[in-house]
């Protein structure tokens, strides 16, 4: 896409957004790869899986939302793949346990479960 007769990717702010996304996705890939190794050797815990589901799906949601924003109004039109990705991906933070449920499980594992006294 172009704005002011130049590709939007050449604007400093947009380069910074894309650099952030690229870095965060690389870090997420390393994290997921380490967890795949644990799955393969049977040592992945429920809490590690919860942390991964929460972090990676929320990252994906931020990245897709940012890409939609970079596309401007076109990003909201279903003719563009980013709009379809935005619609399809939204389920990822809900299905299989919402982000809030993942955080609840992690918090309980940290010993922060509520206990009735008395």
Report each predicted region and the residues it spans.
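Alpha-helical interface subdomain recognition
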Residues: 1-118
């Amino acid at each position: 896409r172009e704005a002011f007769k130049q590709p939007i990717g050449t604007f400093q702010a947009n380069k910074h957004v894309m650099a952030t996304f690229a870095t965060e996705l690389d870090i997420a890939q390393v994290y997921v790869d380490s967890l795949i190794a644990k799955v393969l050797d049977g040592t992945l815990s429920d809490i590690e899986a919860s942390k991964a589901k929460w972090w990676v799906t929320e990252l994906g949601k931020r990245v897709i939302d940012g890409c939609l924003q970079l596309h401007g109004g076109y990003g909201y039109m279903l003719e563009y793949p980013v709009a379809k990705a935005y619609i399809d991906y939204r389920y990822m933070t809900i299905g299989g346990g919402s982000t809030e449920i993942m955080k609840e499980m992690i918090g309980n594992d940290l010993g922060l479960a509520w206990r009735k006294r008395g």
